[in-house]
Amino acid sequence: MKLSVIIPVYNEFESIQVILKRVQETNLVHEIIVVDDGSKDGTRDVLAALDGKNGVRVILHERNKGKGAAVRTGMAAAVGDVLLIQDADLEYDPRDYQQLLEPINEGLAEVVYGSRFLGRAHRVTMFWHMVANRMLTFFTNILYNTILTDMETGYKVFRREILNGMTLHANSFDFEPEFTAKILKRHFRIFEVPITFNPRDYNQGKKIKLHDAFEAVWTLIKYRFVE
């Protein structure tokens, strides 16, 4: 199995070298595709020095297009037969890779989500973000007749072939609901595993806002009845 890790990046000067080191230390990765989404804080200078070393491939967006656009760019460039999405902000711990990959390696699932709500150790998160995550997951379960615990998780791992015939349009944080909706409509098996989680707050650079939840609701409804 060849694992491609896709890391969308926007203004992560303080964390990018740390997360790359943590990913490399897993010794599970064939390639690391870093998509810089128009960073303005010096992140690009760091990436320029790392490109082509230790499995790192850097792709640059000339302007900020959004997380979803960066993930889609990474997916198109990946050569592995299993793809894993890794945020650059240190909220998600690559030491969970082994557990995330196990259901795929054992043939139990084509898609694995790392759930922040299944009991592993985690730093206390912001209350209203937790409520929004729970409500969006509940809404997903109603619309798509499933029993997920964490639709909005950043840790999504999947076999490359599930992308065959799937067109993704999301440019922003609506990637999570669009991807989930299209996976569930195609009846792929999703396996959830518990992960550790160390959430940032806005002072530390957290980018997602509560208004993104309203866009997620619309995305879930839209793709329930189209495509």
Where do the PLM segments sit?
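Cell-envelope/extracellular polymer assembly enzymes that use nucleotide-activated donors
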Residues: K2-S4, E31, E178
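A conserved hydrophobic helix/loop-capping motif in glycosyltransferases and polysaccharide synthases
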Residues: L3-E12, I19, T26, V35
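Acidic helix N-cap motif at the loop->helix transition within catalytic regions
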Residues: E14-V18, D41-L50
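Short beta-strand/loop segment that forms part of the nucleotide-sugar
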Residues: L20, Q24, V29-S39, I59-H61
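Conserved donor nucleotide-binding strand/loop of the catalytic core
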Residues: H30-I33, R44-A77
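A conserved acidic beta->alpha catalytic loop
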Residues: D36-D45, L90
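Acceptor/aglycone-binding surface of glycosyltransferases and processive sugar-polymer synthases
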Residues: R63-A77, V82, P94-F173, P199-I221, ...
